[in-house]
């Protein structure tokens, strides 16, 4: 295939390297001839580096470079060109002008593809005399390493173009996902779940950026925390994408931006590229703050509470309701069980017992015990109020299994600092021969940090599936390949279970009153029907044909 790439910047040269290495003849052009020269030199250096590392033979390198043809004139006649990939700046008028000139220079058989990441494919195509010949082909940077491409048909795109582009992408060693022409397409849309919820947690002073990032990495298993990621991408870029997608989906609460970003962008706090973002960078930047050491009495007795969370409220029975918050003692017996936190309570008791902690049994804590409440979409404060627990020494624990050795302790405004330090020391205990746990301390919030981040990631992905913007399998494939998540968001929800995820979403919605946490129809139906979130389900069309 003969492919013309218009635009020799970072994306254009990456696409050129990818296509030429896969055996295609590539015409690389730009209105700036010096950019083409620099791009060819860059591709040559990348291919030679691959030879040095044993990833490519010298013969294959030479053949790929022979297939890379620099053009002085982007609008040159090209009767043999099969495909054009446009990779110029993100501006609708600029792209329309490029395709208008190409339409005059190239045969009608040539397929046009835009690498836009944020503009409507349909609006770009509308500038053409023949809008049916254009589709989106969205690569990610660096192209040779990011092995996922979004294929985006516009409203008028000919039906045979999408499978043809998909075949091209996959024959060149990348994976292709078909995505509807909607704001953010798939990967950028799905990625809003993590960063918008992280910003919401920061707005509420639940934890600082470093604390949220630690939990995202160690509990959820992400490679980077959301604030590290924003600093790497650039907050100016991230904030613009958040705003664009939110506006494009007509101010959908699930995608709501934060008030924190505009002033930081205006102040130049963009991240790595400016030397200062959520964190400081550069040779003179102060070292990152070290997590506070665990202190306190690790031998203090602990009482683990079973709380029911099926409907987002506690079902624990309280016999006697008087609570002495001054002395931190409770006269109420605590009992009860539930589907969400109860299993977490059992697991926590077993783990602490195995670590040698003094875990109390019975219906109520002793006057000296710290009280741990596994929360699932609810708050510690609600458990204190409904179960008559001692407010000064009752703390929340996230029952989500952690990817690494970290536990999370939630403290209320009524918590005693000494009791909190003791609770942290108890949670840090590990069985003989194992490393102690790191223990994050966060402000009491509905569901704690990791639950809210996970719920948002799953919810945004479920809303994409619900709108039929992409198939469940493509959603999970694109997110793992494009965002580096350890598992696709829908499969992640299935690991927890659709019913339990619905319980979490309902509890978050009921506790906060924030519509961003409302459950999707996709999640609700699958929980009710016993289907996994990754199941596309039966369509009406399937019931009328065959």
What are these regions (language model features)?
Residues 8-9:
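Glycine-rich Rossmann-fold phosphate-binding loop(s) that bind the pyrophosphate
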Residues 12-13:
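N-terminal Rossmann-fold NAD(P) dinucleotide-binding loop
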Residues 64-82, 164-173, 179-181, 427-436:
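Amphipathic alpha-helical segments at domain termini/boundaries
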Residues 27:
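Conserved beta-strand positions in the Rossmann-like core of class I SAM-dependent methyltransferases
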Residues 31-35, 49-111, 119, 351-383:
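Rossmann-like NAD(P)-binding element
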Residues 19:
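Aromatic pocket-lining residues of Rossmann-like dinucleotide-binding sites
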Residues 97-146, 153-166, 369-422:
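Rossmann-fold NAD(P)-binding glycine/threonine-rich loop
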Residues 22-24, 174-181, 209-445, 449-452, ...:
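NAD(P)-dependent Rossmann-like dehydrogenase/reductase catalytic/cofactor-binding core
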């Amino acid at each position: 295939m003969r492919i013309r790439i218009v635009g020799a910047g970072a994306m254009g040269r990456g696409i050129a390297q990818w296509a030429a290495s896969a055996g295609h003849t590539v015409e690389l052009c730009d209105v700036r001839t010096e950019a083409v020269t620099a791009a060819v030199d860059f591709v040559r250096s990348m291919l030679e580096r691959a030879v040095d590392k044993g990833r490519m033979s010298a013969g294959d390198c030479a053949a790929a470079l022979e297939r890379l043809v620099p053009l002085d004139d982007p609008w040159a006649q090209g009767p043999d060109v099969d495909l054009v990939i446009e990779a110029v700046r993100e501006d609708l008028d600029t792209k329309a002008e490029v395709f208008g000139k190409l339409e005059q220079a190239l045969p009608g058989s040539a397929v046009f593809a835009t690498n836009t990441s944020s503009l409507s494919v349909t609006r770009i195509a509308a500038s053409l005399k023949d809008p049916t010949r254009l589709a989106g082909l969205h690569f990610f940077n660096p192209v040779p390493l990011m092995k996922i491409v979004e294929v985006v048909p516009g409203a008028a795109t000919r039906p045979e173009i999408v499978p043809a582009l998909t075949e091209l992408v996959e024959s060149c060693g990348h994976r292709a996902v078909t995505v509807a022409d909607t704001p953010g397409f798939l990967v950028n849309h799905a990625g809003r779940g993590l960063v918008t919820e992280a910003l919401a947690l920061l707005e509420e002073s639940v934890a600082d950026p470093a604390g949220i990032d630690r939990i995202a990495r160690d509990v959820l298993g992400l490679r980077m925390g959301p604030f590290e990621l924003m600093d790497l991408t650039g907050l100016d870029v991230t904030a613009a994408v958040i705003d664009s997608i939110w506006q494009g989906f007509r101010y959908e609460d699930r995608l709501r931006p934060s008030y924190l970003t505009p002033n930081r962008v205006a102040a130049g706090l963009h991240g790595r590229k400016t030397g200062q973002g959520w964190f400081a960078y550069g040779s003179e930047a102060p070292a990152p703050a070290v997590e506070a050491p665990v202190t306190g009495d690790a031998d203090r007795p602990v009482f683990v509470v079973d709380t029911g969370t099926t409907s987002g409220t506690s079902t624990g029975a309280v016999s006697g309701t008087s609570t002495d918050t001054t002395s931190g003692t409770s006269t109420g017996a605590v009992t009860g069980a539930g589907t969400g936190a109860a299993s977490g309570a059992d697991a926590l008791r077993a783990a602490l017992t195995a670590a040698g902690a003094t875990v109390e049994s019975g219906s109520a804590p002793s006057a000296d015990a710290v009280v741990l409440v596994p929360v699932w979409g609810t708050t510690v404060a609600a458990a204190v109020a409904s179960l008559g627990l001692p407010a000064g020494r009752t703390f929340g624990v996230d029952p989500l299994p952690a990817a690494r050795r970290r536990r999370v302790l939630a403290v209320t405004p009524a918590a005693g600092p000494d009791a909190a330090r003791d609770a942290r020391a108890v949670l840090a205990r590990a069985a003989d021969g194992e490393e102690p746990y790191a223990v994050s301390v966060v402000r009491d919030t509905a569901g704690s940090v990791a639950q809210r981040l996970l719920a948002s990631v799953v919810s945004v992905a479920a809303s994409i599936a619900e709108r039929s913007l992409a198939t469940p399998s493509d959603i999970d494939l694109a997110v793992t390949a494009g965002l580096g998540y350890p598992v696709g968001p829908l499969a992640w929800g299935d690991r927890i279970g659709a019913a339990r995820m619905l319980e979490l979403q309902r509890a978050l919605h009921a506790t906060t009153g924030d519509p961003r946490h409302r459950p999707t129809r996709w999640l609700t139906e699958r929980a009710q029907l016993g289907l996994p979130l990754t199941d596309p389900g039966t369509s009406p069309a399937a019931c009328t044909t065959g």
